[in-house]
């Protein structure tokens, strides 16, 4: 009797997880709410000192990101997940020179982590089903973009101005993410 109840509970959990992972409307709602909170948290960090304007670099976001409407929802999931993961990784680096609030950064990291957890079951499912997609190509271009951001931070020894430049890039990324999230329709 106990084994049968346990089996039913396991099956129910598996089914509900799959059903939730397929609910793109719910996912879109969660992502939009979370992205808005991330942007709000980033904007709470101290703004750009005037002398940092000289440190600006033109980091080119991959071209395909500028035409987000061309993404299928599966590709959008792969790209969103990659961007969140890369932003998370950048924000775990040494930002001590910035004067940024550790609490705000921790809240931001927690929010990013939650978003990735919502996306991960769908992302894994897509990765298992598809061999090559537009999302895969875009992910490779994104990795190069984020690699360049990290290299920039390293070359500037994680100074305040470098972080200010990267913060602006991350804010732009959240605009792209918000647009991509709009394509997560049923």
From Swiss-Prot:
**Where are glycans found on this sequence?**
131, 173
Q: Which SMART domains match?
A: IFabd (SM00076)
CDD domains for this protein: IFab (cd00095)
Recorded GO CC terms: extracellular space
Q: Where is the signal peptide?
A: 1-21
GO MF: cytokine activity; type I interferon receptor binding
Got any disulfides in this one, which pairs? 52-161
Q: Which UniProt keywords apply?
A: Antiviral defense, Cytokine, Disulfide bond, Glycoprotein, Secreted, Signal
Where does it live in the cell? Answer: Secreted
Q: Where are the transmembrane segments?
A: none
GO BP, sorted A to Z: adaptive immune response; B cell activation involved in immune response; defense response to virus; humoral immune response; natural killer cell activation involved in immune response; positive regulation of biosynthetic process; response to exogenous dsRNA; T cell activation involved in immune response
**Superkingdom of the source species:** Eukaryota
Q: Its function?
A: Has antiviral, antibacterial and anticancer activities.
Q: Which family does it belong to?
A: Belongs to the alpha/beta interferon family.
Query: What is said about its interaction partners and assembly?
Result: Monomer.
What is the protein's given name? Interferon beta-2
The record lists the organism as Bos taurus
Q: Which gene encodes it?
A: IFNB2
